[in-house]
Protein backbone atom coordinates (compact mmCIF):
# COMPACT_ATOMS: atom_id res chain seq x y z
CA UNK A 1 0.00 0.00 0.00
CA UNK A 2 2.78 2.40 0.95
CA UNK A 3 4.67 1.65 -2.29
CA UNK A 4 1.54 2.37 -4.34
CA UNK A 5 0.97 5.64 -2.49
CA UNK A 6 4.59 6.64 -3.05
CA UNK A 7 4.44 5.87 -6.80
CA UNK A 8 1.28 7.96 -7.13
CA UNK A 9 2.86 10.83 -5.22
CA UNK A 10 -0.03 10.91 -2.74
CA UNK A 11 2.06 11.61 0.41
CA UNK A 12 3.57 14.70 -1.23
CA UNK A 13 0.20 15.80 -2.63
CA UNK A 14 -1.45 15.36 0.75
CA UNK A 15 1.12 17.63 2.35
CA UNK A 16 1.03 20.33 -0.31
CA UNK A 17 -2.28 20.44 -2.17
CA UNK A 18 -4.98 18.21 -0.64
CA UNK A 19 -7.33 18.93 2.26
CA UNK A 20 -7.74 15.23 3.00
CA UNK A 21 -7.03 11.77 1.60
CA UNK A 22 -8.80 8.42 1.79
CA UNK A 23 -7.68 5.08 0.38
CA UNK A 24 -9.42 1.75 -0.12
CA UNK A 25 -7.80 -1.58 -1.01
CA UNK A 26 -10.28 -4.19 -2.24
CA UNK A 27 -13.22 -4.06 0.20
CA UNK A 28 -11.51 -2.28 3.10
CA UNK A 29 -10.72 1.37 3.75
CA UNK A 30 -7.08 1.40 4.86
CA UNK A 31 -6.44 5.12 5.33
CA UNK A 32 -8.41 8.30 6.00
CA UNK A 33 -7.03 11.65 7.03
CA UNK A 34 -8.20 15.27 6.91
CA UNK A 35 -6.26 18.44 7.64
CA UNK A 36 -6.85 19.94 11.06
CA UNK A 37 -7.81 23.35 9.68
CA UNK A 38 -10.44 21.75 7.42
CA UNK A 39 -11.78 19.69 10.31
CA UNK A 40 -12.04 22.89 12.36
CA UNK A 41 -14.35 24.32 9.66
CA UNK A 42 -16.80 21.56 10.54
CA UNK A 43 -16.06 19.46 7.45
CA UNK A 44 -16.64 15.74 7.96
CA UNK A 45 -14.54 13.32 5.89
CA UNK A 46 -14.57 9.71 7.01
CA UNK A 47 -15.17 6.17 5.76
CA UNK A 48 -18.76 5.01 5.25
CA UNK A 49 -18.75 2.34 7.95
CA UNK A 50 -17.67 4.88 10.57
CA UNK A 51 -20.24 7.38 9.29
CA UNK A 52 -23.10 4.87 9.51
CA UNK A 53 -22.21 3.91 13.08
CA UNK A 54 -20.97 7.25 14.40
CA UNK A 55 -22.46 10.59 15.44
CA UNK A 56 -23.50 11.36 11.84
CA UNK A 57 -25.54 8.17 11.45
CA UNK A 58 -28.91 9.94 11.21
CA UNK A 59 -27.72 12.23 8.41
CA UNK A 60 -26.19 9.31 6.54
CA UNK A 61 -29.32 7.16 6.82
CA UNK A 62 -31.45 10.04 5.49
CA UNK A 63 -29.41 10.11 2.26
CA UNK A 64 -27.92 6.62 1.82
CA UNK A 65 -29.15 4.92 -1.39
CA UNK A 66 -31.91 7.50 -1.82
CA UNK A 67 -30.64 8.77 -5.19
CA UNK A 68 -29.63 5.29 -6.36
CA UNK A 69 -32.08 2.84 -4.77
CA UNK A 70 -31.41 -0.91 -5.07
CA UNK A 71 -34.44 -1.14 -7.38
CA UNK A 72 -32.77 1.16 -9.94
CA UNK A 73 -31.06 -1.64 -11.89
CA UNK A 74 -29.47 -5.03 -11.25
CA UNK A 75 -26.01 -3.69 -10.45
CA UNK A 76 -27.51 -1.20 -7.98
CA UNK A 77 -29.25 -4.16 -6.35
CA UNK A 78 -25.95 -6.06 -6.19
CA UNK A 79 -24.24 -3.00 -4.77
CA UNK A 80 -26.95 -2.53 -2.14
CA UNK A 81 -26.54 -6.15 -1.04
CA UNK A 82 -22.74 -6.35 -0.76
CA UNK A 83 -21.34 -2.79 -0.59
CA UNK A 84 -18.33 -2.10 1.62
CA UNK A 85 -16.03 0.86 2.14
CA UNK A 86 -16.25 4.23 0.48
CA UNK A 87 -16.25 7.80 1.78
CA UNK A 88 -18.67 10.15 3.50
CA UNK A 89 -18.23 13.91 3.18
CA UNK A 90 -20.29 16.70 4.71
CA UNK A 91 -19.50 20.38 4.11
CA UNK A 92 -21.45 22.70 6.45
CA UNK A 93 -23.48 25.70 5.34
CA UNK A 94 -21.36 28.52 3.91
CA UNK A 95 -18.03 26.68 4.18
CA UNK A 96 -15.63 26.80 1.23
CA UNK A 97 -12.97 24.09 1.24
CA UNK A 98 -10.02 25.81 -0.41
CA UNK A 99 -8.16 22.68 -1.57
CA UNK A 100 -9.54 19.32 -2.76
CA UNK A 101 -10.36 16.15 -0.89
CA UNK A 102 -9.27 12.92 -2.60
CA UNK A 103 -10.21 9.25 -2.39
CA UNK A 104 -8.20 6.49 -4.08
CA UNK A 105 -9.67 3.06 -4.83
CA UNK A 106 -7.52 0.06 -5.77
CA UNK A 107 -8.80 -3.42 -6.51
CA UNK A 108 -5.83 -5.65 -5.83
CA UNK A 109 -7.36 -9.13 -5.48
CA UNK A 110 -7.57 -11.48 -8.46
CA UNK A 111 -11.08 -12.21 -9.75
CA UNK A 112 -12.67 -9.98 -7.10
CA UNK A 113 -15.22 -7.17 -6.98
CA UNK A 114 -15.21 -3.74 -5.40
CA UNK A 115 -18.45 -2.09 -4.25
CA UNK A 116 -17.55 1.11 -2.41
CA UNK A 117 -20.19 3.76 -1.65
CA UNK A 118 -19.43 7.48 -1.77
CA UNK A 119 -21.88 9.93 -0.20
CA UNK A 120 -21.23 13.69 -0.33
CA UNK A 121 -23.49 16.40 1.10
CA UNK A 122 -22.58 20.02 0.31
CA UNK A 123 -24.83 22.27 2.36
CA UNK A 124 -26.27 25.66 1.40
CA UNK A 125 -23.69 28.11 0.04
CA UNK A 126 -20.79 25.69 0.54
CA UNK A 127 -18.09 24.78 -2.00
CA UNK A 128 -16.01 21.60 -2.48
CA UNK A 129 -13.74 19.91 -5.00
CA UNK A 130 -13.57 16.12 -4.62
CA UNK A 131 -11.15 13.93 -6.59
CA UNK A 132 -11.62 10.20 -7.15
CA UNK A 133 -8.85 7.98 -8.50
CA UNK A 134 -9.13 4.28 -9.43
CA UNK A 135 -6.62 1.63 -10.51
CA UNK A 136 -5.89 -2.11 -10.38
CA UNK A 137 -3.13 -4.56 -11.41
CA UNK A 138 -3.71 -6.67 -14.51
CA UNK A 139 -4.80 -10.31 -14.16
CA UNK A 140 -5.94 -12.95 -16.66
CA UNK A 141 -9.38 -13.20 -15.03
CA UNK A 142 -12.17 -10.62 -14.88
CA UNK A 143 -12.64 -8.19 -12.01
CA UNK A 144 -15.80 -6.17 -11.31
CA UNK A 145 -16.18 -2.64 -10.03
CA UNK A 146 -19.78 -1.66 -9.21
CA UNK A 147 -19.47 1.31 -6.90
CA UNK A 148 -22.05 3.97 -6.20
CA UNK A 149 -21.77 7.75 -5.83
CA UNK A 150 -24.54 9.93 -4.38
CA UNK A 151 -24.09 13.71 -4.33
CA UNK A 152 -26.41 16.22 -2.66
CA UNK A 153 -25.77 19.88 -3.54
CA UNK A 154 -27.70 22.42 -1.48
CA UNK A 155 -29.03 25.87 -2.34
CA UNK A 156 -26.34 28.06 -3.97
CA UNK A 157 -23.72 25.38 -3.22
CA UNK A 158 -21.10 24.06 -5.63
CA UNK A 159 -19.40 20.69 -6.02
CA UNK A 160 -16.77 19.70 -8.55
CA UNK A 161 -16.42 15.91 -8.75
CA UNK A 162 -13.32 14.83 -10.69
CA UNK A 163 -12.62 11.22 -11.60
CA UNK A 164 -9.60 9.55 -13.18
CA UNK A 165 -10.34 5.90 -13.94
CA UNK A 166 -7.29 3.91 -15.00
CA UNK A 167 -8.44 0.36 -14.29
CA UNK A 168 -6.52 -2.58 -15.76
CA UNK A 169 -7.85 -4.17 -18.94
CA UNK A 170 -9.47 -7.13 -17.21
CA UNK A 171 -11.89 -4.85 -15.32
CA UNK A 172 -15.65 -4.51 -15.85
CA UNK A 173 -16.39 -0.99 -14.61
CA UNK A 174 -20.13 -0.56 -13.96
CA UNK A 175 -20.28 2.45 -11.67
CA UNK A 176 -23.45 4.46 -10.90
CA UNK A 177 -23.12 8.17 -10.10
CA UNK A 178 -25.94 10.61 -9.40
CA UNK A 179 -26.29 14.19 -8.14
CA UNK A 180 -29.30 16.12 -6.82
CA UNK A 181 -28.89 19.89 -7.20
CA UNK A 182 -31.09 22.41 -5.39
CA UNK A 183 -31.87 26.06 -6.18
CA UNK A 184 -28.89 27.98 -7.55
CA UNK A 185 -26.56 25.03 -6.95
CA UNK A 186 -23.90 23.72 -9.33
CA UNK A 187 -22.49 20.28 -10.02
CA UNK A 188 -19.39 19.98 -12.20
CA UNK A 189 -18.41 16.51 -13.37
CA UNK A 190 -14.87 16.07 -14.72
CA UNK A 191 -14.25 12.55 -16.01
CA UNK A 192 -11.26 10.80 -17.53
CA UNK A 193 -11.84 7.16 -18.59
CA UNK A 194 -8.69 5.41 -19.77
CA UNK A 195 -8.70 1.90 -18.33
CA UNK A 196 -10.90 -1.22 -17.96
CA UNK A 197 -11.96 -3.85 -20.47
CA UNK A 198 -15.58 -2.66 -20.43
CA UNK A 199 -16.96 0.54 -18.91
CA UNK A 200 -20.57 1.68 -18.68
CA UNK A 201 -20.54 5.05 -16.98
CA UNK A 202 -23.19 7.78 -17.20
CA UNK A 203 -23.12 10.30 -14.32
CA UNK A 204 -26.57 11.80 -13.82
CA UNK A 205 -27.56 15.28 -12.63
CA UNK A 206 -31.06 15.98 -11.35
CA UNK A 207 -31.60 19.76 -11.41
CA UNK A 208 -34.30 20.10 -8.81
CA UNK A 209 -34.21 23.81 -7.91
CA UNK A 210 -34.65 27.06 -9.84
CA UNK A 211 -31.42 28.10 -11.56
CA UNK A 212 -29.57 24.86 -10.78
CA UNK A 213 -26.68 24.10 -13.14
CA UNK A 214 -24.84 20.98 -14.31
CA UNK A 215 -21.65 20.78 -16.33
CA UNK A 216 -20.01 17.57 -17.56
CA UNK A 217 -16.55 17.45 -19.14
CA UNK A 218 -15.39 14.01 -20.21
CA UNK A 219 -12.40 12.49 -22.03
CA UNK A 220 -12.33 8.82 -23.06
CA UNK A 221 -9.43 6.86 -24.56
CA UNK A 222 -10.16 3.32 -25.77
CA UNK A 223 -7.24 1.15 -26.85
CA UNK A 224 -6.91 -2.49 -27.91
CA UNK A 225 -9.64 -4.78 -26.48
CA UNK A 226 -11.40 -1.91 -24.70
CA UNK A 227 -15.10 -1.01 -24.95
CA UNK A 228 -15.78 2.27 -23.15
CA UNK A 229 -19.44 3.32 -23.23
CA UNK A 230 -19.72 6.66 -21.46
CA UNK A 231 -21.70 9.86 -21.33
CA UNK A 232 -23.97 11.91 -19.10
CA UNK A 233 -27.64 12.19 -18.14
CA UNK A 234 -29.36 15.41 -17.09
CA UNK A 235 -32.90 15.92 -15.80
CA UNK A 236 -34.17 19.51 -15.83
CA UNK A 237 -36.89 19.53 -13.18
CA UNK A 238 -37.13 23.22 -12.28
CA UNK A 239 -37.32 26.62 -14.05
CA UNK A 240 -34.25 28.33 -15.51
CA UNK A 241 -32.02 25.30 -15.06
CA UNK A 242 -29.00 24.97 -17.34
CA UNK A 243 -26.69 22.16 -18.39
CA UNK A 244 -23.58 21.68 -20.51
CA UNK A 245 -22.30 18.30 -21.71
CA UNK A 246 -18.91 18.43 -23.43
CA UNK A 247 -17.01 15.22 -24.29
CA UNK A 248 -14.16 14.03 -26.48
CA UNK A 249 -13.30 10.41 -27.32
CA UNK A 250 -10.27 8.71 -28.87
CA UNK A 251 -10.10 5.13 -30.16
CA UNK A 252 -7.06 3.23 -31.44
CA UNK A 253 -5.99 -0.34 -32.23
CA UNK A 254 -9.56 -1.60 -32.47
CA UNK A 255 -10.79 0.01 -29.25
CA UNK A 256 -14.45 1.04 -29.10
CA UNK A 257 -15.51 4.36 -27.62
CA UNK A 258 -19.24 5.10 -27.47
CA UNK A 259 -20.86 8.33 -26.29
CA UNK A 260 -24.43 8.47 -24.97
CA UNK A 261 -26.24 11.46 -23.55
CA UNK A 262 -29.78 11.93 -22.29
CA UNK A 263 -31.29 15.34 -21.51
CA UNK A 264 -34.81 15.32 -20.07
CA UNK A 265 -36.80 18.53 -19.66
CA UNK A 266 -39.92 18.11 -17.51
CA UNK A 267 -43.02 20.31 -17.51
CA UNK A 268 -41.66 22.14 -14.46
CA UNK A 269 -38.53 23.28 -16.27
CA UNK A 270 -39.64 26.49 -17.97
CA UNK A 271 -36.84 28.43 -19.70
CA UNK A 272 -34.39 25.54 -19.32
CA UNK A 273 -31.27 25.55 -21.49
CA UNK A 274 -28.95 22.71 -22.45
CA UNK A 275 -25.91 22.29 -24.68
CA UNK A 276 -24.46 18.91 -25.75
CA UNK A 277 -21.18 18.61 -27.64
CA UNK A 278 -19.21 15.48 -28.49
Predicted feature locations:
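Conserved beta-strand/loop scaffold segments within soluble protein domains that form the structured core
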Residues: 3, 7, 11-12, 25-278
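Residue-level "edge-of-site" marker
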Residues: 18
Amino acid sequence: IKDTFDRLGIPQAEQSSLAGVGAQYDSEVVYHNVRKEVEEQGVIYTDMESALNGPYAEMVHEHFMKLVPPTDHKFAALHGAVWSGGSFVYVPKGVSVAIPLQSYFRLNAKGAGQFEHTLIIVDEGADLHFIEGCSAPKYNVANLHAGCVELFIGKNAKLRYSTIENWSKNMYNLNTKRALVEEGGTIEWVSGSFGSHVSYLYPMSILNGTGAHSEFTGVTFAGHSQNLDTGCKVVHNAPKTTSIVNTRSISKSGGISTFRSSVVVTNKAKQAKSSVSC
